[in-house]
């Protein structure tokens, strides 16, 4: 395989049409077809099948596409970092952050780095870990800061624990539960909830707690990964939600209280996720160093 072959494959896989790919890459269609045949012969497998006027990637083709996209991203990162070093800049840090990290720890870390290195450029994407880690695997993010998965055995990822916290049931201070001392799991199951997507660990834990008690999954009112939307909606309705003890102490959670049940408290560990075989840029290393200092400052919880 050579780089030109992989570029041609990427153009073909993204367009799913040999004619369009050939035009985009300024090559004749017979020339592109010949290059793709040679690549498939070298790999010993078919990368695509013809379907009408287009093509459809095989499983091998989809696997190669993931790696070629990652390679292109890493080459762009290398180019940016080398140019940054040459110009005296430390480069670009692309960070994915979970909701509870956006209001204090991450901004404090970024501010510290900017104070010492004003030429660093940050891009921050927000959301829950499942989606962000997917982007990390594709090379679209350098690191993800947020909740760590229970299973941390992954050949492609590196995990660094920074803190732990407790996820609790919350609602507005006027919620009927605030005046009800005895609350059963069935009471909670009968409420309407604001929750993240089904793929998120915290929602799976909640569903499992109800299942073990022989109850149906919670009634979903709003599905969102936006902390601000969740808190605002909780203040205006009698819905329930889940958030960390740390969030409850912050100004943005004013008017929101814990409405605990012992079966619905979940310990969560949080930290930094990065690609195991990727070299982190100086700017990303600076942010990680500051996050570690802040984790020590505020303690393990």
Name every feature range the model reports, one short phrase each.
Residues 11-31:
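Short helix-boundary/capping micro-motifs
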Residues 40-62:
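A short LG(V/I)-centered, amphipathic sequence patch enriched
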Residues 90-151, 216, 223-224:
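Central regulatory/effector-binding core of bacterial HTH transcription factors
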Residues 147, 177-183, 191-213, 280-288, ...:
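Secondary-structure junction motif
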Residues 153-160, 165, 180, 228-277:
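Beta-alpha-beta core module
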């Amino acid at each position: 395989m050579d780089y030109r072959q992989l570029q041609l494959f990427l153009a073909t896989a993204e367009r799913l049409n040999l004619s369009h790919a050939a035009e985009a890459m300024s090559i004749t269609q017979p020339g592109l077809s010949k290059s793709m045949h040679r690549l498939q012969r070298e790999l010993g497998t078919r990368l695509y099948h013809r379907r009408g006027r287009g093509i459809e990637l095989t499983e091998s083709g989809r696997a190669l596409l993931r790696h070629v996209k990652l390679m292109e991203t890493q080459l762009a990162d290398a180019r940016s970092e080398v140019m940054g070093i040459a110009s005296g800049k430390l480069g670009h840090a692309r960070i994915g952050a979970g909701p509870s990290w956006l209001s204090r720890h991450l901004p404090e870390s970024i501010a510290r780095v900017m104070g010492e290195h004003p030429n660093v450029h940050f891009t921050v994407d927000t959301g829950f870990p499942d989606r962000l880690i997917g982007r990390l695997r594709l090379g679209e993010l350098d690191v993800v800061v947020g909740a760590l998965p229970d299973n941390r055995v992954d050949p492609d990822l590196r995990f660094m624990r920074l803190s732990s916290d407790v996820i609790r049931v919350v609602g507005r201070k006027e919620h009927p539960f605030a005046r009800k001392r005895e609350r059963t799991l069935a009471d909670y199951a009968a409420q309407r909830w604001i929750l993240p997507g089904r793929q998120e660990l915290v929602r799976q834990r909640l569903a499992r707690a109800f299942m073990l008690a022989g109850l149906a999954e919670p009634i979903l009112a709003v599905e969102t990964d936006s902390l601000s939307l969740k808190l605002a909606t909780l203040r205006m309705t009698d819905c329930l939600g889940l958030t960390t003890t740390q969030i409850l102490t912050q100004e943005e959670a004013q008017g929101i209280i814990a409405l605990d049940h012992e079966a619905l408290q979940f310990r969560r560990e949080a930290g930094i996720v990065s690609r195991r075989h990727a070299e982190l840029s100086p700017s990303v290393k600076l942010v990680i160093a500051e996050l570690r200092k802040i984790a020590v400052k505020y303690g393990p919880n």
